[in-house]
């Protein structure tokens, strides 16, 4: 037996004929009669008829009242690429889970890659999204300097992009109003100094995130203005920015060093760009036994920050919730709107709310009422 004949033993003749018919309809890209299909494929009319009826039954073709058959446009399943900030950052994990649930609920596939809080990794992941030809990219990475490189790779592939919290060229912005969430955090700090320390504040520290760029840095700008709105006569020298990089251990060391250098100052306000930074400051304050001398407000309202705020005498007096659970549904809705060609705003802000030990206690009381 020749090799050619042995290979034919594995073929299914009727399936080959069915594929010939489908490929003809795809190539012609217009309605066809049974007679025309029979004539061009040279397949028996009986077989053509049965194959066409099977395709109609399975939804691959439709038959019009005049007897013409045409292929049904079967839209492919959409696939979004998501570059998560880091699996080690609680807020990023919450956003990822919210996005996974929202995408699954509408039948959108997700290609999830971890940016590992690292610019080089984020740029490599952008190349992976292009290689995999995703329909849309949702980018959540921290390095402003990497943003134009990532954005250019995605734009060159003609893939639309949504950027979370940090603006990227060519991308639609999605996230918090950074200045506003900072301002409201500052108001909480100012109110604490007013009520607990008789309007005294020796220092107002901002645990900043400069690598994320000016927009994210406006969280600290807003916090300083929020404090000034309550205590207007504070000298400019008492406002100090410290680069905490949004990381817990780094923030702990920096605040610990600051407290060691200022042992006799008992009215220190700290605004942190993230709760992870805020919790590092809490660690430092607790290690130094300075809980009564320091008040801290964070951003994101992650689970550990909520738990910390319920502790008696905690220096963490508040956090601004960015409502991570709302990110997923809103991102998916925004992404689908972009792909449908709808006009969307260049900046899309999420809702936020201030959470304090008092609001937590009130919510718990209502839950048990």
Give each language-model segment a name.
Residues 144-180, 196, 203, 302-311:
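Flexible loop/hinge segments that line or gate small-molecule binding clefts
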Residues 78, 215, 227, 322-369:
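Hinge/cleft segment of the Venus flytrap/periplasmic-binding protein
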Residues 104-106, 157-159, 227-235, 262-264, ...:
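Short helix-capping segments at alpha-helix termini
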Residues 83-97, 112-121, 143, 175-185, ...:
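Hinge/beta->alpha junction and helix N-cap segments in small-molecule ligand-binding domains
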Residues 129-130, 136-155, 223, 243-308:
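Hydrophobic alpha-helical
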Residues 130, 189-194, 259, 331-343:
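Short, hydrophobic alpha-helical segments
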Residues 3-10, 72-87, 131:
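N-terminal helix-turn-helix/winged-helix DNA-binding helices
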Residues 2-73:
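N-terminal helix-turn-helix
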């Amino acid at each position: 037996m020749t090799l050619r004949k042995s290979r034919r033993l594995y073929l299914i003749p009727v399936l080959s004929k069915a594929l010939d018919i489908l490929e003809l309809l795809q190539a012609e890209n217009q309605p066809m009669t049974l007679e025309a299909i029979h004539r061009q494929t040279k397949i028996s009319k009986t077989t053509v008829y049965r194959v066409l009826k099977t395709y109609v039954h399975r939804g691959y073709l439709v038959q019009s009242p005049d007897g013409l058959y045409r292929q049904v446009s079967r839209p492919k399943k959409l696939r979004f690429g998501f570059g998560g900030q880091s699996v080690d950052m609680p807020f990023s994990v919450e956003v990822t889970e919210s996005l996974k649930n929202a995408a699954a609920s509408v039948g959108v596939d997700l290609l999830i890659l971890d940016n590992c809080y690292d610019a080089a990794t984020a740029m490599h992941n952008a190349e992976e999204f292009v290689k995999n030809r995703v329909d849309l990219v949702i980018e959540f990475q921290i390095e402003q300097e990497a943003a134009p490189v990532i954005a250019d790779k995605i734009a060159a592939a003609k893939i639309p992009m949504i950027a979370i919290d940090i603006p990227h060229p060519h991308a639609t912005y999605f996230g918090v109003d950074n200045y506003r969430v900072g301002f409201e955090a500052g108001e909480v700090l100012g109110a604490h100094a007013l009520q607990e320390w008789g309007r005294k504040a020796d220092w107002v520290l901002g645990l900043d995130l400069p690598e994320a760029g000016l927009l994210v840095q406006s969280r600290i700008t807003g916090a300083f203005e929020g404090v000034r709105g309550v205590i207007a006569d504070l000298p400019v020298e008492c406002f100090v920015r410290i680069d905490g990089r949004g990381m817990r251990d780094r923030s702990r060391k920096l605040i610990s060093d600051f407290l060691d250098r200022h042992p006799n100052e008992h009215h220190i306000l700290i605004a942190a760009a993230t709760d992870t930074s805020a919790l590092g400051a809490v660690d430092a304050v607790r290690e130094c036994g300075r809980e009564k001398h320091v008040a801290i407000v964070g951003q994101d309202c992650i689970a550990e920050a909520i738990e910390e705020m319920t502790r008696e005498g905690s220096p963490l007096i508040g956090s601004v919730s960015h409502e991570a659970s709302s990110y997923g549904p809103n991102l998916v809705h925004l992404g689908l709107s972009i792909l449908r060609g709808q006009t969307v705003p260049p900046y899309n802000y999420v809702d936020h709310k201030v959470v304090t030990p008092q609001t937590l206690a009130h919510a718990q009381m209502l839950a048990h009422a």
